[in-house]
Swiss-Prot record:
Family: Belongs to the class-I aminoacyl-tRNA synthetase family.
GO molecular function: aminoacyl-tRNA deacylase activity; ATP binding; leucine-tRNA ligase activity
Protein name: Leucine--tRNA ligase
EC number: 6.1.1.4
Organism name: Leptospira interrogans serogroup Icterohaemorrhagiae serovar Lai (strain 56601)
UniProtKB keywords: Aminoacyl-tRNA synthetase, ATP-binding, Cytoplasm, Ligase, Nucleotide-binding, Protein biosynthesis
Motif window: 'HIGH' region: 40-51
InterPro entries per record: aa-tRNA-synth_I_CS, aa-tRNA-synth_Ia, Leu-tRNA-ligase, Leu_tRNA-synth_edit, M/V/L/I-tRNA-synth_anticd-bd, Rossmann-like_a/b/a_fold, tRNAsynth_Ia_anticodon-bd, Val/Leu/Ile-tRNA-synth_edit
């Protein structure tokens, strides 16, 4: 007799859909539980068996919480814009709107086959204009805001305009102008100043350009695409940026508010990269024609300032052309061209050969003006980090050491230590060779020396103590078609303005030709009718922005839209947002441990500042599921031929087998190899459960109206206790193991006590919902078990009358025995000695010591 899984699973999936079993009552008075999966990018390949792992875990918890009396929000949607979809469309020749819809339909079909309890009435896609209307709305709010450093929060740009009108730039770390000067600036001049404060701004920056992809890549995306074989070079372009750096402190500090894996917290902290140090200017021997007096650098090691023997400026730094002497101009320009062909990843490679060119210019060391210091350019310094220039201390920095060795530059030790073969970097040694007519720090440790140098620099007004972040502003524009249009218009007057909010969504035009131009222009530049825009308030004709948003944009706020997906007026009803946020549990791959989470947190904090959300953080608890590898223990890949399709597994063994096996493989966070034999084993377990409730033919369902024995109640309540403990802790494998123990205990018996086995069905339901629903129905119940009360353990059946005591001889485990819970020391030792195995070991030996650890072990020491 075999469990008819195909018939059962088909029936219950149809039942859940028709009865809308998992639709959330969003205004329910029950306690809420918001359980969210990172929504997938719907690729043409469809799901493989690694995808359902996280989905099954959240489904188990969601079903468990419903049965515990919670109102559960458990939605699903699609992160469907972006470069992969566009590339796939170009390969197939089919428009991305069509391929994306087909891919979504396939993903949805596969997910529904697994029996996941999503509320499909809340399904969303980032490509839906009704959705990206609010992605564009958030963009406009960011564009129309600035970050007030005094309040440490965003404000309307109108507040900044009022401030400039009343007091100029007084009190801001910005070039100074008064209110009268502000009023006399032209609209273009005013806009240029405001752009330096807006949370969205344009900047001419060196970007990562990929000719083959026809687009700019964010620094964070380069590694992925280079890994796929694409060449990425540096190219100066005018790009839209988001001022995420304004939120660096809050992004760092508020990590204390969340319950995330330690490794993820560490990655977030490292990416933000807070460091304290000294910002100081090294003056030119004579000021430049532009009036620039020196090169500004930031260092975390002020104590090593006397060890500076040269300076390095990034090749793409704007001052390079200004500081290069005529004699060095050709060499410098050739080097700049060569370095532009390298990605930041290549340039940061620690073991690469150091290259560079002398600019012909010198500065002097402000701590020791007698020291004339040459200024070089080298690609191991990046313009986007710090100030784009460094003071090089080769004695105490390995990259500087290698560069100095390559070019024969001086190496001056200023910290006690050995530097003959490598740089010596220490914060525990004292300073040497660090004295001048200006200041001396000889004999001081790192802390004292750094503090003294900073105080001296501030007193001389040539430097200041500063907090620096590794975090860079977010490169937000992409030169591609398949993304959210940016709702800005450029006017001939030189002013850029957002379109009125009443005109949102700005719908992506339907282009037949959507391949990259190769010039750096987006394909949207081809939409001639769409490009032209007339300002409704002034009548001025402008040109729409043709770049589109990155794929990250739509995924920054989707968790809010699930709460109120049909709201046409606002991204989420404030009352509902207040009830349902933050997300209680967020589950997804660790590959999103930095970027998606960082960008979502940034947007959420901005929305908090403008009153659109009520919480400081979007995601309370975070869990990363481990990868499921192929049977060959390598990452699943079409090229390796080791991909396992869930459709095939479900067809052969059923959805409940797939669910149970993926949860039984091991701890959720661990990397685990797939095993078809393992699925077969779980399938046999489901058949044993089926036979436990049936005898003879399929129809002979059996439950007995008999009182359970104390032993039966004991195993039941032990199972109830274990499952109740393990599900909230994501210990699904040990919960399933306990369910297996239960079945093993009951299978040999001819008794089928109804009270016990009905409770077992409810315990099984979160893990294997199809078979559980069918058994529940066959037991005579008229309703789905989805909202039945989850069993709770009765403490009286959890009391153990016996304990297990292990026996060691000379500290090595030799045997074990059961004893009464209150066994005395003498009885426990006596029982241990009388075990057959122990008797054999003790024969002819002298017991020198007897040790008893109450309730745990007996250790006999023999000579």
């Amino acid at each position: 007799m075999q469990y008819p899984f195909q018939e059962v699973e088909s029936f219950w999936q149809k039942f859940w859909e028709e009865h809308k079993s998992f639709q959330t009552n969003i205004r329910s008075s029950k306690p809420k539980f918001y359980c969210l999966d990172m929504f997938p990018y719907p690729s043409g390949a469809g799901l493989h068996v690694g995808h359902p792992e996280g989905y099954t875990a959240t489904d188990i918890l969601s079903r468990f919480k419903r049965m515990k009396g919670f109102e559960v929000l458990h939605p699903m949607g699609w992160d469907a814009f972006g470069l992969p979809a566009e590339r796939y469309a170009m390969q197939t020749g089919i428009h991305p709107a069509i391929t994306t819809k087909d891919n979504i339909d396939n993903f949805r079909r596969q997910i529904q086959m697994i029996g996941l309890s999503y509320d499909w009435s809340r399904e969303l896609s980032t490509t839906d204009p009704d959705y990206y209307k609010f992605t564009q709305w958030i963009f406009i709010q960011l564009y129309q805001s600035w970050f007030n450093p005094e309040l440490k929060k965003a404000e309307s740009i109108n507040e900044l305009i009022r401030r400039f009108s009343n007091q100029g730039s007084n009190g801001l770390d910005y070039r100074q102008f008064n209110s009268e000067e502000w009023k006399n600036f032209s609209p273009v001049e005013k806009e240029k100043i405001l752009s330096d404060f807006r949370l969205v701004y344009q900047a001419e920056i060196p970007v990562n350009w990929c000719e083959a992809l026809g687009t700019v890549l964010a620094n964070e995306e380069v590694e992925e695409w280079v890994g796929k074989g694409y060449e990425v070079v540096r190219k100066p372009m005018r790009q839209y940026m988001m001022r995420i750096t304004a939120y660096a402190d809050r992004l760092l500090e508020d990590l204390e508010l969340v319950e995330w894996p330690p490794s993820t917290l560490e990655m977030q902290k490292n990416w933000i990269g807070k460091s304290e140090g000294l910002e100081i200017t090294f003056p030119f021997l004579k000021p430049l024609q532009s009036g620039l007096e020196g090169i500004r650098i930031f260092t975390t090691r002020p104590d090593t300032i006397f060890g500076v023997t040269y300076m390095v400026v990034a090749p793409e730094h704007p001052i390079v052309s200004e500081i290069t002497t005529p004699e060095q101009k050709q060499k410098v320009e050739e080097y700049q061209k060569t370095s532009s062909l390298k990605s930041d990843l290549d340039r940061m490679e620690l073991n690469k050969e150091k290259t560079g060119v002398f600019t012909g210019t010198f500065v002097f060391n402000p701590a020791d003006p007698s020291q004339k210091i040459p200024v070089w350019i080298s690609d191991y310094v990046l313009y986007g980090y710090g100030t784009g220039a460094i003071m090089a201390v080769p004695a105490h920095d390995q990259r500087d050491f290698e560069f100095a060795r390559t070019f024969g530059l001086k190496i001056i030790p200023v910290i006690e230590g050995e530097i003959s073969e490598a740089a010596f970097d220490s914060k525990t040694s004292t300073c040497i060779n660090s004295s001048s007519s200006e200041i001396s720090i000889n004999g001081l440790d790192y802390t004292s020396a750094s503090s003294k140098i900073i105080s001296w620099a501030e007193s001389k007004k040539i430097g200041r103590k500063k907090i620096q972040f590794k975090l860079r502003d977010w490169l937000f524009a992409r030169q591609r078609y398949w993304g959210e249009p940016i709702p800005l218009v450029h006017y001939p007057s030189g002013v850029t303005k957002p379109i009125p909010e009443s005109e949102l969504p700005l719908v992506l035009p339907n282009l037949e030709e959507f391949k990259p131009s190769g010039t750096g222009e987006s394909p949207l530049a081809l939409a001639k009718d769409w490009l032209q825009y007339k300002d409704p308030s002034t009548g001025e004709i402008g040109t729409r922005e043709t770049n589109t948003m990155p794929q990250w944009a739509g995924s920054c706020w989707y968790y809010l839209r699930y709460i109120d997906p049909k709201n046409g007026r606002f991204l989420c009803d404030p009352e509902l947002e207040k009830k349902w946020m933050p997300v209680n549990l967020y589950v997804g791959g660790s590959e999103h441990a930095v970027l998606h989470l960082l960008y979502s947190r940034f947007w959420h904090k901005f929305l908090f500042d403008i009153g659109a959300v009520s919480t400081k953080e979007p995601f309370d608890k975070l869990i990363h599921q481990g990868l499921i590898l192929g049977e060959d223990k390598r990452k699943m890949s079409k090229s390796l031929g080791n991909v396992v399709n869930p459709d095939d597994v479900i067809k052969e063994y059923g959805a409940d087998s797939l669910r149970l096996f993926e949860m039984f493989m091991g701890p959720l966070e661990m990397v685990k190899p797939w095993s078809t034999r393992g699925v077969e084993g779980v399938f046999r377990f489901l058949n044993r459960i089926w036979r436990l409730f049936h005898s003879g033919s399929q129809e002979s369902f059996r439950l007995d109206d008999v009182e359970p024995t104390p032993e039966e109640l004991k195993i039941l309540h032990k199972t109830i206790q274990k499952v109740n403990e393990d599900i909230p802790n994501f210990s699904f494998n040990t919960a399933i193991a306990q369910l297996m123990i239960f079945v093993n205990e009951f299978t040999p018996s001819d008794r089928r006590p109804k009270k016990v086995l009905e409770s077992f069905i409810l315990l099984l339901a979160p893990f294997a919902p199809h078979i559980a629903e069918e058994l529940w129905k066959r037991s005579g119940k008229m309703e789905s078990l989805s909202y039945e009360k989850f069993p709770e353990a009765d403490p009286q059946y959890l009391i153990e009358s016996e304990i297990l005591i292990v026996v060691q001889v000379n500290g090595k485990l030799r045997d074990e025995f059961k004893a009464p819970k209150d066994v005395s020391q003498s009885d426990a030792i006596s029982m241990a000695k009388n075990l057959d195995k122990i008797k054999g070991i003790l024969e002819g030996k002298t017991i020198r010591k007897e040790i008893y650890v109450p309730g745990k072990l007996v250790n006999l020491v023999i000579g």
